[in-house]
């Protein structure tokens, strides 16, 4: 059945879906892009390739907004000691995002759906596992700078690939990596994640634009702009409500929801 543009892809619907997704993401410190993708493909009935591109564009809106908000409330001073790690992770992530975006346009829709399914199930499983892990843990990597730099590049490559193939900012991978591998505090990791995500997502969006993903301007006005606005509003509200519900419980529940949604929508 053909989608009903006036209902399924209306700006109001995009806003109303974006807000609760942003709210739930904000409660666990994420932007919610991994939860938007099933909505774009399942509810708004975009093909997988188009859904990934639009999700990435919305992710750019949320990352820029989050950086502006954090810049006015938090200090960037704690990041100074992480500059080599952040720069190395950006180098790897941007390189992989450039290549990954091209792959999105080269593989078949069916193969892309299978790849999306696998990644979403992995991310959902990671959320479930993370719900049972302590937040304050020593970094697994040694303090030797060369080791940390090389590791950051390789981590960045994986993060950039996932970002480009799912259209996500990558916070769901960057933050746990910084916390568990590099021993970074959760708040500092959240800010560093945004700095790493911004160039990664920007490169992906520019590549998608060059490859014609945003040729239909109606997608930008009816879906990207309102869903981006809703996601930002929801994320801000979620930030204020942190602690109302235990993050571990939310991660477990959202992990299960993500896996079920991914299987229902992308398993054909």
Task: Name each model feature, range by range.
Residues 1-22, 42-43, 48-50, 69-165, ...:
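Juxtamembrane transmembrane-helix boundary motif
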Residues 18, 22-30, 56-59, 63, ...:
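N-terminal transmembrane alpha-helices
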Residues 29-36, 165-177:
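Transmembrane helix boundary and interhelical junction motifs in multipass membrane proteins
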Residues 33, 59-70, 100, 200-208, ...:
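Alpha-helical transmembrane segments and their lipid-water interface positions
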Residues 37, 61, 100, 125, ...:
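Alpha-helical transmembrane segments of polytopic integral membrane proteins
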Residues 39, 152, 161, 173-177, ...:
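Non-catalytic alpha-helical scaffold/packing segments enriched in small hydrophobic residues
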Residues 52-63, 190-201:
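Transmembrane helix-bundle signature of multi-pass membrane transporters/permeases
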Residues 174-195:
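Aromatic-anchored, glycine/proline-accented short structural segments
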